[in-house]
């Protein structure tokens, strides 16, 4: 599928399929004609699976069936000029029925209170939160071929749904490219005289594309959750924690560069955006940090740019530096033209001194700095800072201490050892707890730690979990 085809269909489906405007209809009809029904349907399945990842296969399949059917009917030669508008209106009405077979969304009921085009636009804007914990598990070669031989089309549909709903934050061209290559591999190897050898060879050839797709899904998911400014802060925190001996001038350009890449590539319909941009970023990583840190130097000996990127991405935090405590930025720092520079400097200095996961630091720093910046809009900013700074400092300190307590021992131990130490700490803290109560607390705390105490923890899930744990501190 050529880049322009993906571009046009993505735009048409993402923003306009339900609108019924002539120019949008023409785009979709052009794609149906160019791609053919089967590829058009496959691309529709990918798009709706990534848009509604919490839905069932049956719900997404039913929606795709309706969309393909109305597109075929309304794009046929001699079709009624009002066909597209009529059929999309019927689809939006059907979506509002209590037993509608389509993806379920909490916003549907509100959309159904609207009429006509307004309802269609409301429906078109609905989407689920992306999956932050991909659960797709590839079957064995034998299981793949058994399912493929039994029902090739059914296997392909199920795979497109499962993979696209789990890795839907990867740029669309990467998702299309990988899934198409995967299904081609299955078709070739399951009809081969030596399927095991075939799968081994094909997977080796697809390895870099697979890594690029899954890693792009990771970083784009984080970017989608944070937005551009918080992503920039997040990358700065991570780099400062990984290389606390570096200078701000070494790490800030890297944080900004990666943020700019994600802003360009995550929603790009260019086939090679990530493949072109990430290798250039790894050169900058090695140029800035390989001489500052032995682990980054080791990463830069990896044989491929993707290897370097993955090595640096998954690198754990280093021991924080033992440096004098730093003061919060003042009104002079935050209310002048150099406010961004002051916030970057404070974020960097706090991060290199602090051993608490990035999701904690990003959350509390965002709240702290935002509250102080609001003082700049008051009549007496100096007085506001004098009042707010001590409060923010106490909240910041309490938050970090609580985060360190929640994640204590996690990064330095295997999961089994961590759970043992956690049980010992909880037993000491609550000596009267029954074995069942203790087991429940260990399970709850260890589940939280496994998801939110690493350097690349998913922001959406962990933010809500941290809110629940830190409510008293955040509301103080």
Curated annotation (Swiss-Prot):
Sugar-bearing residues? 288
Q: Which residues form the Albumin domain?
A: 17-208, 209-394, 395-476
Q: Name one GO molecular function term.
A: vitamin transmembrane transporter activity
SS bonds (residue pairs) = 29-75, 74-83, 96-112, 111-122, 145-190, 189-198, 220-266, 265-273, 286-300, 299-311, 335-376, 375-384, 407-453, 452-462
- GO terms for cellular component: axon; cytoplasm; extracellular space; perinuclear region of cytoplasm
Q: Localized where? A: Secreted
Could you provide one GO biological process annotation from this protein's UniProt record?
A: response to steroid hormone
Keywords of this entry: Actin-binding, Disulfide bond, Glycoprotein, Phosphoprotein, Repeat, Secreted, Signal, Transport, Vitamin D
| Predominant location | secreted
Signal sequence, start to end: 1-16
Q: Supply the Gene3D superfamilies for this chain.
A: 1.10.246.10
Similarity comment: family membership = Belongs to the ALB/AFP/VDB family.
What does it do?
Involved in vitamin D transport and storage, scavenging of extracellular G-actin, enhancement of the chemotactic activity of C5 alpha for neutrophils in inflammation and macrophage activation.
Q: How does it assemble?
A: Associates with membrane-bound immunoglobulin on the surface of B-lymphocytes and with IgG Fc receptor on the membranes of T-lymphocytes. Interacts with LRP2; the interaction is required for renal uptake of GC in complex with 25-hydroxyvitamin D3.
Supply the name of the protein. Vitamin D-binding protein
Q: Which organism is it from?
A: Rattus norvegicus (Rat)
